[in-house]
A protein has these predicted regions:
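Loop/turn elements at helix/coil->beta-strand transitions in domains of secreted/extracellular proteins
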Residues: 1, 56, 72-73, 115-119, ...
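Structural recognition of the beta-strand scaffold that forms the well-ordered cores
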Residues: 1-5, 9-11, 46-47, 73-79, ...
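Signal-peptide-cleavage-adjacent N-terminal segments of secreted and extracellular proteins
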Residues: 1-67, 161, 287, 295, ...
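Mobile gating loops/cap/lid regions near enzyme active sites that modulate substrate access
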Residues: 19, 175-193, 208, 212-215, ...
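Conserved SGNH/GDSL esterase-like catalytic core that processes O-acyl groups on lipids
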Residues: 25-151, 155
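Active-site rim elements
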Residues: 30-40, 85-89, 191-197, 283-294
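Sec-exported extracytoplasmic/periplasmic mature domains
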Residues: 50, 54, 102-106, 158-165, ...
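Extracytoplasmic, non-cytosolic globular domains
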Residues: 124-238
Length: 315
């Protein structure tokens, strides 16, 4: 059984239609052929992790009553745009997402016996940091804020474990300075290395936090899914496996707003498209300004960095 917590890198349809582009064309054009609430043209990380574990993708929490027969495979509590703290998105932060699981346990939807065989995927893709910058957080205080984010993430992971979930894998931050949102200013040619340095601080603190959790529980039940090195492998064009995709400029997205202020899926008051769309998403690592294509996720999933850390779910 798989539970997912976090943000748009894991969300498979929780975020409300009114507040997100992921329910609008052209999202979902590769799979399932229409918008599904995933922030991609197709699959996202949760789908690949579930496949690796030989499980069905857990349904979104908001559909638990309509698809009650699928609840036995786990649930996805992730909401796009959220963080460990509140962000600009009025959706449940990670603490509230864990509250949802707590309530289901209280209601006997999941028993302690069942939870002992379950695992959790935790995604933190950086929305807390975007919110900090957009609300004029100071550069000098940024490292301290990163520490507070990691501290809260550590609290959240410990709580998931205390509820009975057996193993918890948390994804490291990707090189955020290399996302199309941050490379657009250089015509998708150069990464923002200042931002990447802050990412490394987060990832180093996260490693320390996971080590501390394992020491406290005298176990190896907490681990990092190495999304950072997986992305770096793909960015650098390193051979992944025979038949693995080769992407055109990895910093350039398939779908992007025509000018600043517009995004993938944006339309004007007459319904006219205000974005450009590539002819074949399989040739692009990124779908939009921040999220990989389905083929991008497949490439990331196929890297040794990702595969080797996923093994800890079943070891």
């Amino acid at each position: 059984m798989l539970f997912a917590f976090g943000d748009s890198y894991a969300d498979t349809g929780n975020t409300k239609i009114a507040v997100t582009r992921s329910w609008h064309f052209p999202y979902g054009i590769t799979f399932p052929g229409k918008p599904s609430g995933r922030f991609s043209d197709g699959f996202v990380s949760t789908d690949f992790v579930a496949g690796y574990l030989g499980m069905k993708t857990p349904i979104p929490y908001r559909w638990r009553k309509e698809l009650s027969g699928r609840v036995k495979y786990g649930l996805n509590f992730a909401y796009g745009g959220t963080g460990v703290f509140d962000t600009l998105v009025a959706e449940p932060n990670m603490t509230t997402q864990i509250d949802f699981l707590q309530q289901l346990i209280n209601d006997s939807v999941y028993t302690k016996r069942v939870l002992r065989t379950s695992v959790a995927l935790v995604s933190l893709a950086g929305n807390d940091y975007s919110y900090y910058l957009e609300t004029n957080g100071s550069a000098a205080a940024f490292p301290g804020f990163i520490q507070s984010v990691v501290n809260q993430l550590m609290v959240n992971m410990k709580r998931i474990h205390d509820l009975g979930v057996r193993k918890i894998g948390v994804m490291s931050l990707i090189p955020l300075g290399c996302t199309p949102q941050n490379t657009a200013g250089s015509s998708f040619q150069r990464c923002n290395e200042t931002e990447n340095d802050l990412v490394m601080l987060h990832n180093n603190l996260l490693l320390q936090a996971v080590n501390t959790l394992n020491q406290q529980t005298n176990s190896t039940l907490f681990f990092i899914i190495d999304l950072h090195n997986a992305f770096s492998t793909v960015f650098n064009g390193t051979e992944i496996h025979q038949g693995s995709p080769t992407f055109e400029n990895p910093f350039e997205p398939c779908c992007f707003g025509v000018t600043e202020g517009f995004f993938c899926g944006s339309v004007d008051e007459n319904g006219g498209k205000k974005y450009t769309l590539c002819s074949n998403p399989k040739t692009k690592l990124f779908w939009d300004g921040n999220h990989p294509t389905s083929e991008g996720w497949r490439a990331i999933y196929s890297t040794p960095a990702f595969q080797n850390t996923l093994k800890q779910f079943i070891d």
